[in-house]
From Swiss-Prot:
One annotated GO molecular function: small GTPase binding
Chief location bin: cytoplasm
InterPro entries attached to this UniProt entry: Leu-rich_rpt, Leu-rich_rpt_Cys-con_subtyp, LRR_dom_sf
SMART domains linked: LRR_CC
The protein's role, per its UniProt record: Negative regulator of the mitotic exit network (MEN), required for multiple cell cycle checkpoints. Required for daughter cell separation and chromosome stability. Involved in copper sensitivity.
Gene Ontology biological-process annotations: cell division; mitotic spindle assembly checkpoint signaling; mitotic spindle orientation checkpoint signaling; negative regulation of septum digestion after cytokinesis; protein-containing complex disassembly; SCF-dependent proteasomal ubiquitin-dependent protein catabolic process
Protein name: Antagonist of mitotic exit network protein 1
Residue stretches of biased makeup (Low complexity): 99-112
Pfam families xrefs: LRR_6 (PF13516)
Family: Belongs to the AMN1 family.
Region ranges (Disordered): 27-58, 99-119
Length: 511
């Protein structure tokens, strides 16, 4: 059908005709261009050779739209399969919608949806997102495939050693040793920061180093070496299990600790002599194990031993101490508290052979008369003693003066509880002359003959003025004396300050 009015047909509507009549006006409406969101219901119009417009029937327009829909669906499926060619798609669009610069499109009746699937072209955001997601999935799959062999152990496996092959890098002993070493150091450091003691050999499964035992044979071997460095037993059952499991293997620990095992004796602990190689031992401790002693033949190899802790032992005596001390040139810490069978003879032998000794505790509640000033003098002359425990011993004022003159500058901790022979002519006078300038801890409980604490309090005030912490621990009587002396010194200081200020003000008035 050909319409008679060519102007109307040229512009598409009467409104367009009205706009075209004022084409040269500055307020003229711009020509609408084709966009991907424009409606194409009327794109079936074609220009005839006579210059008039021919409109196809409505059924033809629907068929044209149907063909366009098929084209775009095919393009979308190619894009999703990764076979899309941007250049080819652009040509398809140009072929499907032929336009010329002079051709004008009619105003659409309705606006299509912006996210219509028909317009998922390479230039659209939806298509770009689809391609990007496909590429990311592909990369992730490649990463998972490439690094799948780097798993240490198969978590689904119920056996100790996994049947899954681990990456070769985790089977190099040097690398495994560095990893386990760092875990071991971190675990020990955390225990020290939290104030925890070293765990028992039968440790919980939460231990990081213990968990490394189940990784592989290489990891098991390396981890055992670190776990065997520090052996501590708090129950007799754990010690028995250890002896039964390691009956044929030698271990070289750096520390061996038996803690409060009164039911263990030398007969049922002979397996330790077979299993333990003492060459690397630095810390040997039998804490409150009254019926067991380390074998004497061990000490011939214990040249590296630095700590020997045997408190509450009923078997140790001077003969045993004299035999072992000659093999302990590097001993630094000796704890023989409540070892009632030790006398001056044993301590003098220790002072003679153990030149590196810095801490010695020989305090006791019974047989205090067995330790006298001879032991104190031997330690003061021959060792580098800094911490000395003499609680309950038969110490006199003369021995304290010997200690102060020989090594008073080195003493940092001094325990003199229940040393009933000490009087005001020893400690109070020594503090008055500042014989212990580096003393930080002083224990003077239950010393009946000490009544003058004035110089101790002044020493304490002097330490505080230098911001150096100091602890003077006494019984109730001595504590009250110290508090009263502090109050009097403070009152005297205020009185002196008031007097000086008054004198200064009066001098200003006279001038």
């Amino acid at each position: 059908m050909v319409l008679p009015d060519s102007n109307i047909m040229k512009n598409g509507s009467i409104k367009r005709l009205r706009d075209s009549q004022i084409e040269n006006s500055p307020y003229s409406r711009p020509i609408k261009k084709i966009t991907p969101n424009s409606s194409h219901e009327d794109l079936s119009a074609t220009i005839s050779n006579e210059g008039s417009l021919n409109f196809t029937p409505r059924t033809s327009r629907q068929e044209s739209l149907y063909n366009m829909k098929k084209i775009f669906q095919k393009t979308y499926s190619q894009t999703k399969l990764g076979l899309f060619s941007s250049k080819k798609q652009v040509n398809t669009l140009e072929t499907a919608i032929p336009t010329t610069p002079k051709q004008q499109l009619p105003t659409p009746t309705t606006s299509p949806e912006k996210n219509n699937i028909l317009w998922s072209t390479p230039n659209s955001l939806t298509s770009l997102r689809t391609i990007s997601n496909d590429l990311d999935d592909c990369r992730n799959r490649n990463l998972i495939t490439d690094f799948s062999e780097l798993s240490i152990i198969n978590s689904s496996s119920s056996s100790i050693y996994s049947t899954q092959q681990s990456h070769p890098i985790f089977e190099i002993p040097e690398i495994v040793d560095n990893i386990v070493k760092q875990l071991y150091l971190i675990e020990n450091e955390q225990d020290l920061l939290n104030g925890h003691h070293k765990k028992d050999v039968n440790r919980e499964n939460t231990s990081t180093v213990v968990s490394c035992l189940a990784v592989s044979k290489t990891w098991n071997k390396v981890s055992k070496g670190y776990l065997m460095r520090d052996l501590k037993f708090t129950k007799s059952t754990s010690l028995t299990n250890f002896l039964s499991q390691c009956s044929t293997k030698k271990t070289t620990p750096q520390s061996l600790i038996l803690h409060k095992m009164s039911d263990i004796n030398n007969n049922n602990s002979r397996g330790l002599e077979i299993i333990i190689d003492p060459k690397q031992l630095r810390h040997l401790e039998y804490y409150v194990c009254p019926n067991i002693l380390p074998p004497v033949n061990w000490f011939q190899s214990l040249t590296k031993l630095e700590k020997l802790i045997l408190p509450g032992n009923k078997l140790i005596n001077d003969s045993y101490l004299i035999q072992i001390c000659r093999y302990l040139p590097n001993l630094k810490v000796l704890d023989l508290r409540a070892c009632d069978n030790i006398t001056d003879a044993g301590i003098v032998a220790v002072g003679t052979h153990c030149k590196q000794l810095v801490s010695c505790n020989i305090g006791r509640h019974r047989n205090g008369s067995s330790i006298t000033g001879l032991s104190v003098v031997a330690l003061a002359k021959n060792t580098m003693i800094r911490t000395l425990g003499l609680a309950g011993c038969d110490i006199t004022d003369a021995s304290m003066w010997e200690l102060a003159q020989k090594c008073g500058k080195n003493i940092e901790r001094l325990s003199l509880n229940n040393c009933n022979k000490l009087t005001n002519f020893s400690l109070p006078m020594l503090f008055a002359f500042n014989y212990f300038p580096n003393l930080n801890v002083l224990e003077i409980q239950n010393i009946a003959k000490i009544t003058d604490v004035r110089h101790m309090v002044r020493y304490k005030i002097w330490k505080r003025s230098q911001r150096i912490p100091i602890l003077i621990k006494g019984c109730d009587r001595i504590t009250k004396l110290i508090h009263e002396e502090e109050r009097q010194i403070k009152a005297q200081s205020l009185k002196t300050a008031r007097k000086d200020m008054t004198l200064w003000v009066n001098q200003l008035e006279n001038e």
